[in-house]
Amino acid sequence: MAIVGVGIDLVSIPDFAEQVDRPGTVFAETFTPGERRDAADKSSSAARHLAARWAAKEAVIKAWSSSRFSKRPALPEGIHRDIEVVTDMWGRPKVRLSGEIAKHLEDVTIHVSLTHEDQTAAAVAIIEEP
């Protein structure tokens, strides 16, 4: 397998928390019901966990963009909603794609790592192809 794209994103948790549930913001329709449910089940702030998931979505988009270097970006509408961060029974994150982006990335493996500490959430995404 060869790495074809790497993306990273940082999110200010306080800034994100102010906007996440505000109508009319990009965040209002960004998260799937499963992502919101998982964040609500955590012992700490739901906004902290959603901020890490937002960072993961952005990191995936950046990794995808970097894999298309010198090619026109082809980002479909509502792309963030089509990138879902799910976890296994041990809490390890994985990206599940749907919609148009799933068609563009059907033959790749996406690795993702999320973290949050104090006021910041971060994520890294690596895209590999066979």
From Swiss-Prot:
InterPro entries: 4-PPantetheinyl_Trfase_dom, 4-PPantetheinyl_Trfase_dom_sf, ACPS, Ppantetheine-prot_Trfase_dom. GO terms for cellular component: cytoplasm. Mg(2+) binds at residues 9, 58. GO terms for molecular function: holo-[acyl-carrier-protein] synthase activity; magnesium ion binding. GO terms for biological process: fatty acid biosynthetic process. Its cofactor is Mg(2+). Pfam families: ACPS. Its EC number is 2.7.8.7. The keyword Flavoprotein does not apply. Keywords: Cytoplasm, Fatty acid biosynthesis, Fatty acid metabolism, Lipid biosynthesis, Lipid metabolism, Magnesium, Metal-binding, Transferase. It catalyses: apo-[ACP] + CoA = holo-[ACP] + adenosine 3',5'-bisphosphate + H(+). It is an enzyme of class 2 (transferase). Gene3D superfamilies: 4'-phosphopantetheinyl transferase domain (3.90.470.20). It is found in: Cytoplasm. Belongs to the P-Pant transferase superfamily. AcpS family. Transfers the 4'-phosphopantetheine moiety from coenzyme A to a Ser of acyl-carrier-protein. This is Holo-[acyl-carrier-protein] synthase. It comes from Mycolicibacterium smegmatis (strain ATCC 700084 / mc(2)155) (Mycobacterium smegmatis). The lineage of its organism: Bacteria, Bacillati, Actinomycetota, Actinomycetes, Mycobacteriales.
